[in-house]
Regions:
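Glycine- and acidic-residue-biased ligand/ion/polar-headgroup-sensing regions
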Residues: 49-71
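A short, N-terminal "cap"/entry segment at the start of jelly-roll beta-barrel domains
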Residues: 1-35, 43, 65-67, 71-94, ...
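A generic structured-segment signal
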Residues: 32-37, 44-49, 53-56
């Protein structure tokens, strides 16, 4: 990916790309449930988190994320690792996620529409189920 392509993708995410996973499994008035399953070297593009959410690693692995503020973070996960995030009014986080390990890396992410300080971002797709 060129720097120009990365910048265009980042700008789109900042504007409101709410696709926080690869597959939207379910959506109700209260939650959105997503999955991510990345082969080594695969990447989920920049996306924007505005809702309170949590993710759980369903396979162990290692990732690299680039953030809109310029930070770069590498993280190792054990199966079952879970992390929670909370956002206040107008707060958000924009990042990408790349599998830099040598095995598949998978997550389930649950966005909490009910109880979040921000409205959910609109999506251009419907849940698979």
């Amino acid at each position: 990916m060129t720097d120009e392509q990365r910048k265009a993708e980042l700008d789109k995410a900042i504007a409101g790309n709410g696709m926080v996973g690869q597959r939207l499994l379910s959506e109700t008035d209260e939650v959105r449930v997503w999955t991510i399953d990345l082969a080594p070297g695969e990447r989920v593009g920049y996306h924007k988190h505005v809702l309170n959410y949590f993710w759980t690693a369903t396979r162990a692995g290692k990732s690299r994320s680039h953030y809109a503020d310029g930070r770069v973070a590498e993280v190792e996960y054990k199966e079952g690792t879970t992390r929670h995030f909370t956002f206040g009014p107008g707060e958000s986080m924009v990042h990408d996620l790349e599998n830099i390990g040598d095995s598949r890396l998978s997550f389930t992410t649950v966005e909490l529409k009910k109880g979040s300080a921000n409205a959910p971002l609109p999506l251009a797709l419907k849940p698979e189920n």
